[in-house]
C-alpha cells in the first residue's frame, strides 16, 4: 500500500461536481453565443495558472512530497513541524482554498469545473488531517512516513555520491524535526500510538546504525564521509532518544484513540466526499463480510470438506511460497502481468517493472507495500516491499505470519499487477500534471483491492477453490478493517475486540491481527480499501450497462485509471455524467434487503 493517508503523497478528497446538466446556449442571439465559451476559456486558463502556483506552493511547504515526486532540488529537506510551521501550512491552504472556490461554475467549462473540484478536494483533505483530526498533536503516524529516507537509499535517480549528499542533508535536518515532533505531542498518548512511535523511531535508529553505513561505504569523498559520520551519529541518537521517550510514556497510556462519530463522518466527506450515514455504511460493510464468508464456505466445502472455516484457511496458509514470501512474490509477478495481457483486462502503458524486496526495519507496520517513483522521475524501478515477521514473536506466530501461496498471489495482484503499480503507470501518464501528483487513498487502495476480486473472476491461477480462498482471505481482511474503523472510532469498539474480529472473521494469524487492530486506531481511513472497491464495483456496473460490448471491461478500466486519482464520487460524475455522488455496490440479494 501507499502508506498512512495523513502523510502519504496522496491527498484524498473532492468537491461535488455539477456536470452533465444538458443546458445549452440559446438558439437565438447566435452572434453572442461564443462569448460564454470565450469567457470560460479565459477562466480555465486562469485556473490552470492557479493550479501551477498551487503545485509550486505544495513543493515549498511539503519538500518531502516534492522530492518523492522527483523534484530533487528539494532533496534532503524536511518540513517545518514547529507550531508556527504547521500554522503557516494551514494558513496557506486556507488561502488557496479561497482562491479556487472563487472560480464559479458559470465561469468554467466542464473540464475546468472538474479540475477546480479536484484541487479543492486535495486542499480539504490536507486541512482535515492538519487541523480537524488532531493528529499533529497525538499521532506519530502524522510524521513517520514523511521522515522515510528510502528514496535516497533505494531509488537510483542519481549517482550514489549525489544521493549520499542528499541523505547527509536529510540526516542533518532530522534532529531538529524530531525535536519539533516531540514538542507537538500532547501527553498522555493512546497506547497504540506509542507502540507505533516506538517501533518506527526505534526502527529508524536500528536502520541508521546497522544498514545505512554499508550503503555509502564505497563513496570516496572524504569530506562527505566525515559529514555522514557526524550526522549519522546525531540521527541515531535523535531517533533512539525519541523511541525511548515514547516508551517512557507507556505507563501513562490511554485508550483515547476514537475520533467520534461526528469527526469520523467529517473525515469521510472531507477526504473522499462520501456523505452516507454511518449506520448505512456499517450495514454495507456487514453485508460484504457476509457475502465473502458465504463464498469462503462454498470454496472450503470443495477444498477441505468437513473442516471448519478456520481449519480450511489454515490448510491454504500452510502451503507456503518456496523460498519465503519475497521469493514467492518475485515468481508471481511475471505470471500476473502475462495474465493481464492474455485476458485483455486493462492496458499496460509502458515497459516498467516492479521488483520485490524485504521491507526495511523502520517500515514494517504492514505486511506489504510498494514504493513507486514520482511523475517527474523517468525509467526508474518500483519496489514491492514485504515485511518479515517480528523477531520478538514466538516461532509459531512468525511462521503463521507468512501467507500461503494463494493468499500471496492476491497480495502481489494488489501491490503490482494490476493493482498499485499498474494504476500508477496510468496516473503518471495522466494528461494533467495535477492528476499525476495527487492520488487519493480510496482511489489507490480501492482500485488495488478491486483488482484482486476482478483477477479471480477473470480466472487467475485457474480460479481453483484454493485460489479463491486466497482471494477471499484478503477480502475478509479488508471487510474487517472497514468495520473496525467504524467500530473503533464511532462505536466504542476496543482494540481487543477488533483483534478478535480479525482472528475470527478474517482468519488472521495472531501477529497480523494485532497489527491490523492497532492500525485501525491511528489510520481511521483504512476502511477505504473496501469502501473504494465497492464504489468502483458500482461504477463499473453502471458504466458497462451504458456502454456494453465485448471489450467493455477493459474500456472501463482504462477510462477509470485515466483521471489520475480523484475521489471516486468525482470520477463517477465524469464517467456517467451528472453530479458526483457516493454509491457503494452490494450483492443483489443484499441490495434488495437494504
Give residue spans per PLM region.
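Bacterial N-terminal signal peptides that target proteins for export
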Residues: 1-9
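Core hydrophobic alpha-helical transmembrane segments of single-pass membrane proteins
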Residues: 11-15
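C-terminal motif of bacterial Sec signal peptides marking the signal peptidase cleavage site
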Residues: 17-20
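N-terminal maturation segment of proteins
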Residues: 22-594
Amino acid at each position: 500500500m501507499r502508506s498512512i493517508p495523513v502523510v502519504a503523497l496522496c491527498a484524498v478528497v473532492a468537491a461535488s461536481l455539477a456536470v452533465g446538466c444538458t443546458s445549452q446556449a440559446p438558439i437565438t442571439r447566435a452572434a453572442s453565443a461564443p462569448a460564454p465559451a470565450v469567457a470560460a476559456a479565459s477562466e480555465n486558463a486562469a485556473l490552470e495558472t492557479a493550479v501551477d502556483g498551487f503545485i509550486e506552493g505544495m513543493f515549498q511547504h511539503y519538500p518531502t512530497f516534492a522530492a518523492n515526486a522527483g523534484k530533487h532540488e528539494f532533496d534532503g529537506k524536511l518540513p517545518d513541524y514547529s507550531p508556527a510551521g504547521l500554522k503557516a501550512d494551514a494558513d496557506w491552504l486556507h488561502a488557496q482554498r479561497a482562491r479556487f472556490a472563487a472560480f464559479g461554475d458559470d465561469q468554467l467549462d466542464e473540464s475546468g469545473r472538474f479540475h477546480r473540484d479536484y484541487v479543492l478536494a486535495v486542499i480539504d483533505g490536507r486541512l482535515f488531517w492538519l487541523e480537524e483530526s488532531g493528529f499533529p498533536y497525538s499521532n506519530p503516524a502524522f510524521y513517520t512516513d514523511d521522515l522515510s529516507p528510502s528514496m535516497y537509499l533505494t531509488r537510483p535517480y542519481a549517482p550514489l555520491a549525489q544521493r549520499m549528499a542528499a541523505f547527509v542533508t536529510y540526516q542533518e535536518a532530522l534532529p531538529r524535526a524530531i525535536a519539533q515532533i516531540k514538542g507537538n505531542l500532547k501527553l498522555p498518548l493512546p497506547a497504540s500510538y506509542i507502540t507505533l512511535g516506538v517501533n518506527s523511531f526505534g526502527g529508524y535508529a536500528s536502520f541508521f546504525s546497522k544498514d545505512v553505513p554499508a550503503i555509502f561505504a564505497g563513496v570516496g569523498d572524504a569530506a562527505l564521509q566525515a559529514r555522514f559520520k557526524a550526522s549519522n551519529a546525531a540521527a541515531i541518537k535523535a531517533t533512539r532518544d525519541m523511541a525511548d521517550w515514547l516508551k517512557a510514556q507507556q505507563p501513562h497510556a490511554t485508550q483515547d484513540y476514537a475520533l467520534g462519530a461526528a469527526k469520523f463522518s467529517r473525515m469521510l466527506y472531507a477526504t473522499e466526499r462520501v456523505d452516507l450515514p454511518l449506520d448505512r455504511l456499517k450495514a454495507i460493510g456487514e453485508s460484504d463480510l457476509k457475502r465473502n464468508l458465504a463464498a469462503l464456505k462454498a470454496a472450503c466445502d470443495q477444498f477441505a470438506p468437513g473442516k471448519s472455516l478456520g481449519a480450511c484457511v489454515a490448510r491454504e496458509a500452510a502451503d507456503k511460497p518456496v523460498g519465503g514470501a519475497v521469493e514467492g512474490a518475485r515468481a508471481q509477478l511475471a505470471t500476473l502481468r502475462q495474465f493481464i495481457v492474455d485476458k485483455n483486462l486493462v492496458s499496460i502503458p509502458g515497459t516498467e517493472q516492479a521488483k520485490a524486496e524485504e521491507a526495511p526495519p523502520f517500515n514494517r507496520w504492514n505486511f506489504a507495500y510498494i514504493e513507486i517513483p514520482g511523475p517527474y522521475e523517468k525509467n526508474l524501478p518500483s519496489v514491492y516491499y514485504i515485511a518479515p515477521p517480528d523477531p520478538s514473536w514466538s516461532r509459531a506466530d512468525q511462521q503463521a505470519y507468512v501467507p500461503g501461496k494463494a493468499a500471496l498471489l492476491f497480495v502481489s495482484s494488489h501491490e503490482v499487477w494490476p493493482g498499485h503499480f499498474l494504476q500508477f503507470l496510468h496516473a503518471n501518464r495522466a494528461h494533467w500534471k495535477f492528476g499525476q501528483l495527487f492520488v487519493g487513498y480510496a482511489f489507490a487502495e480501492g482500485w488495488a483491492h478491486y483488482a484482486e476480486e476482478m483477477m479471480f473472476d477473470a480466472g487467475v491461477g485457474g480460479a481453483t477453490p484454493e485460489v479463491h480462498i486466497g482471494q477471499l482471505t484478503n477480502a475478509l481482511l479488508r471487510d474487517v478493517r472497514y468495520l473496525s474503523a467504524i467500530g473503533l472510532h464511532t462505536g466504542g469498539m476496543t482494540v481487543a475486540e477488533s483483534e478478535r474480529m480479525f482472528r475470527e472473521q478474517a482468519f488472521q494469524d495472531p501477529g497480523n491481527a494485532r497489527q491490523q487492530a492497532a492500525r485501525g486506531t491511528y489510520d481511521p481511513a483504512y476502511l477505504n480499501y473496501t469502501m473504494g472497491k465497492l464504489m468502483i464495483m458500482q461504477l463499473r456496473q453502471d458504466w458497462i450497462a451504458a456502454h456494453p460490448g465485448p471489450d467493455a471491461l477493459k474500456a472501463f478500466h482504462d477510462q477509470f485509471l485515466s483521471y489520475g486519482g480523484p475521489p471516486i464520487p468525482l470520477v463517477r460524475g465524469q464517467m456517467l455524467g451528472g453530479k458526483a455522488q457516493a454509491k457503494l455496490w452490494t450483492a443483489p440479494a443484499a441490495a434488495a434487503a437494504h
